[in-house]
């Protein structure tokens, strides 16, 4: 652009004045950071900062960010950026209007128009009559470039005035000559597939050459059609570029929100200072630390409670064992005294006869004490181990077996009693309607299930609620072979799940009689009972089974055990 401001030799005083004016215009239109000329669009669009200075878009994107703000490179004033970043800053429309007017040649006939052409990136064409002037028209007859003044002077006669003169933008393209027949211009395009590598042809090629008889079209319409498709493609590319740029800006904003950074803020007296703005990553880490800190505190409290339970159990056991020690010591002393007395009596026959009743009483006392010792010894397990089991909520249970209360419910004839006795005695029991309830204890691994089997007839169902108290798990049995009773089972299960006393109870559904031909599958029963909707927010599981063979029953107990007992302690004896 500086070259455009240099006065040409012979340009005169006016040319020098116009050149200096063009230089001043260019200086106004330059970015003060990169010294490149502003443009109407693209990376060199002028944008306004809060302080009033104008910087091109490209330089603004290169400025260091302070949180969500940038500093003016000239006066260091702060400008806050919104969610759109630099793209959200206002354009300098006064400069844009000036640029547009310069490119349209509205400012000055020579100097400013010349500068505008330079700004727009086009080559400057000099007037063929006077090189100090810039050409603005083209004479198609004379084939010369002329400025408006020289065009009037050279074509002032009647003959020359008839020459067609067009603006430079409408200047016809020079015809390309055929490489085979150099005296003929290319006028046609071959449309044959085999000729697409060399489709251009002149009239000789068309009539007599290698393109003879080929389908063809006229060069200019074909070029215009391709040119239109190129313009469409360029428009699509611009749209696509804008989409990519917008997406990139969003990515930059998201990265800034994730990483956080420094933000420039003003205090009460107007002094600017930086402060740290935490990103979403730091907030997430803080949430994790807070969660695990609370978890550690909760675990510490649960550990203290569990240790207090174990300590109390150990203390009670030691007190009882020491009491037994004292009792055994007293018993041993009494036995020793009786033996010594008997030994003393047997030394004299007369004394033995006289002490007969006393000896009889001693023997009876010893027999009673021996009987008591035998009974106590049978019930005492001399085992120093202290077995413990942990529940899912980190509570500790001491003892060889953890007791679980289970209620088995379902429609009549579903197989509840058959399942109970198969688990208890491992034998099949013929179906008999349950009048009232059955209760059995089933030991499985280190768990002891106390299972209450309640009758499922219509008149007994209102009594189910009396068995809900302290129930830890509900086993609901469904007859898979009776499709017509599924809706009735769904209704009873829905009522069951509304009970407050069963709010925290586990739900195990046995799809019984899977061995019967035509029985509903587990998936079909799940859908017909709407289990995903009905049991939302509750721990539940459905297990296909056959009460006759026992298939699937222990898989159900396994699921119950895993839900009730912490992982890794199921097999601890």
From Swiss-Prot:
CDD domains: ARD1, Bbox2_TRIM23_C-IX_rpt1, Bbox2_TRIM23_C-IX_rpt2, mRING-HC-C3HC3D_TRIM23_C-IX. GO terms for cellular component: cytoplasm; Golgi membrane; lysosomal membrane; nucleus; plasma membrane. Pfam families: Arf, zf-B_box, zf-RING_UBOX. Its EC number is 2.3.2.27. It is found in: Cytoplasm; Endomembrane system; Golgi apparatus membrane; Lysosome membrane. GO terms for molecular function: GDP binding; GTP binding; GTPase activity; identical protein binding; ubiquitin protein ligase activity; ubiquitin-protein transferase activity; zinc ion binding. One of its GO terms (biological process) is vesicle-mediated transport. Residues 351-378 form a coiled coil. GTP binds at residues 411-418, 454-458, 513-516. A zinc finger (RING-type) spans 31-76. Residues 390-573 are annotated as: ARF-like. It catalyses: S-ubiquitinyl-[E2 ubiquitin-conjugating enzyme]-L-cysteine + [acceptor protein]-L-lysine = [E2 ubiquitin-conjugating enzyme]-L-cysteine + N(6)-ubiquitinyl-[acceptor protein]-L-lysine. NCBIfam families: small_GTP. The RING-type zinc finger domain is responsible for E3 ubiquitin ligase activity. Acts as an E3 ubiquitin-protein ligase. Plays an essential role in autophagy activation during viral infection. Mechanistically, activates TANK-binding kinase 1/TBK1 by facilitating its dimerization and ability to phosphorylate the selective autophagy receptor SQSTM1. In order to achieve this function, TRIM23 mediates 'Lys-27'-linked auto-ubiquitination of its ADP-ribosylation factor (ARF) domain to induce its GTPase activity and its recruitment to autophagosomes. In the C-terminal section; belongs to the small GTPase superfamily. Arf family. Homodimer. Interacts with PSCD1. Interacts with UBE2D2. Interacts with TBK1 (via N-terminal kinase domain) and p62/SQSTM1. This is E3 ubiquitin-protein ligase TRIM23. It comes from Rattus norvegicus (Rat). The lineage of its organism: Eukaryota, Metazoa, Chordata, Craniata, Vertebrata.
């Amino acid at each position: 652009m500086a070259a455009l401001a240099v006065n040409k030799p012979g340009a005169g005083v006016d040319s020098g004045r116009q050149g200096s004016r063009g230089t001043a215009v260019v200086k106004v239109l330059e970015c003060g950071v990169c010294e490149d000329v502003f443009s109407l669009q693209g990376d060199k669009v002028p944008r306004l900062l809060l302080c009033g200075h104008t910087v091109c878009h490209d330089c603004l994107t290169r400025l260091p960010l302070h949180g969500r703000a940038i500093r003016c490179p000239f006066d260091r004033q702060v400008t806050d950026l919104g969610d759109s970043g630099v793209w959200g800053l206002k354009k300098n429309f006064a400069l844009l209007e000036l640029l547009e007017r310069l490119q349209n040649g509205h400012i000055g006939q020579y100097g400013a128009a010349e500068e505008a052409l330079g700004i727009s990136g086009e080559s400057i064409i000099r007037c063929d009559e006077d090189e100090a002037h810039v050409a603005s028209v083209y004479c198609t007859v004379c084939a010369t470039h002329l400025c408006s003044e020289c065009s009037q002077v050279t074509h002032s006669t009647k003959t020359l005035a008839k020459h067609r003169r067009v603006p430079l933008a409408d200047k016809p393209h020079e015809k390309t000559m055929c490489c085979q027949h150099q005296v003929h211009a290319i006028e046609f395009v071959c449309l044959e597939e085999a000729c697409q590598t060399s489709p251009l042809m002149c009239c000789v090629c068309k009539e007599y050459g290698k393109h003879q008889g080929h389908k063809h079209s006229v060069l200019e319409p074909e070029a215009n059609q391709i040119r239109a498709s190129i313009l469409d493609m360029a428009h699509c590319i611009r749209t696509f570029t804008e989409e990519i740029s917008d997406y990139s800006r969003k990515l930059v904003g998201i990265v800034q929100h994730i990483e956080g950074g420094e933000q420039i803020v003003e205090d009460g007296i107007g002094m600017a200072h930086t402060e740290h703005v935490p990103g979403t990553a730091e907030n997430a880490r803080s949430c994790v630390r807070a969660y695990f800190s609370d978890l550690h505190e909760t675990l510490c409290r649960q550990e203290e409670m569990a240790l207090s339970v174990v300590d109390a159990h150990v203390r009670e056991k030691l007190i009882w064992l020491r009491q037994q020690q004292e009792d055994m010591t007293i018993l041993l002393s009494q036995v020793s005294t009786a033996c010594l007395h008997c030994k003393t009596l047997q030394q004299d026959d007369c004394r033995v006869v006289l002490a007969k009743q006393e000896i009889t009483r001693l023997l009876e006392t010893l027999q009673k004490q021996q009987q008591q010792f035998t009974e106590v010894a049978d019930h005492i397990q001399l085992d120093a181990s202290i077995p413990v089991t942990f529940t899912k909520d980190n509570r500790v249970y001491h003892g060889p077996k953890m007791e679980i209360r289970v209620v088995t419910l379902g429609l009549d004839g579903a197989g509840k009693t058959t399942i109970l006795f198969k688990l208890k005695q491992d034998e099949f029991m013929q179906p008999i309607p349950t009048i009232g309830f059955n209760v059995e204890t089933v030991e499985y691994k280190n768990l002891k299930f106390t299972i209450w089997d309640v009758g499922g007839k219509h008149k007994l169902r209102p009594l189910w609620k009396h068995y809900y108290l302290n129930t830890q798990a509900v086993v609901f049995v469904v007859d898979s072979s009776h499709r017509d009773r599924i809706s009735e089972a769904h209704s009873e299960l829905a009522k069951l799940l509304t009970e407050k006393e069963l709010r925290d109870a586990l739900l195990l559904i046995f799809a019984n009689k899977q061995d019967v031909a035509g029985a509903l599958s587990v998936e079909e029963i799940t859908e017909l009972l709407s289990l995903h909707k009905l049991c939302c927010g509750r721990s539940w599981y459905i297990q296909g089974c056959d009460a006759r063979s026992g298939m699937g029953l222990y898989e159900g107990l396994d699921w119950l055990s895993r839900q009730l007992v912490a992982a890794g302690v199921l097999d601890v004896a």
